[in-house]
Amino acid sequence: GYGLIEHSSNKSFHLDSGFIRLNEKDTLSERLFMLSRELGKIIDRLNPNCGAIEKIFYAKNAQSALSLGHARGVILLKFSERQLPIHEYQALKVKQTVVGAGRADKGQIQHMVKILLNINDTLQEDQADALAVALTHAHLWRAENNW
């Protein structure tokens, strides 16, 4: 999932969000190529000034961890190619920042993201997660830079 917000003063605004759908039947290299191509298009279209992603802390199994690692590599590469900084946050920090509780579940995250960004439409889990990371970055960057 991806999400773009704008943060000014003490308010965040939802600009865009979605997800990249990959075909599970494709080979790993084909899926990574598609991810790279589609993410590049999204970055070019939305023109963000930075990126923020969740750090991998836990995966259900080794294969999931490897797949997540490959996808993260593509994401880091696409931002690096465009000389855009990318920031990483632990899932616990994202949950604490957005919901106020480190053990928040996906439903709580979706609910708070919709409230914080004044979104009435349904959000997919991946969209809500991406927007939660964006909100975390905006909040922490603002605090760190006394803005």
Name these PLM-found stretches.
Residues 1-147:
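Phosphate- and other anionic-substrate recognition elements at nucleic-acid/protein interfaces
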